[in-house]
Amino acid sequence: MWLLKRIVIFPIWVYQVALAPYLTPCCRFQPTCSAYAHEAINKHGIVKGIWLAGKRILRCHPCGKSGYDPVQ
């Protein structure tokens, strides 16, 4: 199971390391959406973690709320 988690988390890590530093910061929440996804998958498993991350990404838009939103 840990290998499958690592495979799912790897693209998030690549984004955080290779792409995010060169993009304009646009996430309205703390932690960022990618950090939230990483933590949600580690804490809740792959299926629920991806579900929570997807819901979070859909909430992250210019007309939405902002602020501290930790993984529950």
UniProtKB/Swiss-Prot annotation:
The job of this chain, per UniProt, is described as: Could be involved in insertion of integral membrane proteins into the membrane.
The family classification in the record reads: Belongs to the UPF0161 family.
Q: Which UniProt keywords apply?
A: Cell inner membrane, Cell membrane, Membrane
Q: Which residues form a coiled coil?
A: none
* Matches recorded under NCBIfam families: membrane protein insertion efficiency factor YidD
Instruction: Output this protein's name.
Output: Putative membrane protein insertion efficiency factor
In this record, what's one Pfam family? YidD
Q: What is its main location?
A: membrane
Please indicate if the UniProt record lists Membrane as a keyword: yes
Q: Which InterPro entries match?
A: Membr_insert_effic_factor_YidD (IPR002696)
Give the membrane topology, semicolon-separated if more than one: Peripheral membrane protein
Q: List the subcellular locations.
A: Cell inner membrane
Key word Cell membrane present: yes
User: Which superkingdom, per the lineage?
Assistant: Bacteria
| Cellular component terms (Gene Ontology) | plasma membrane
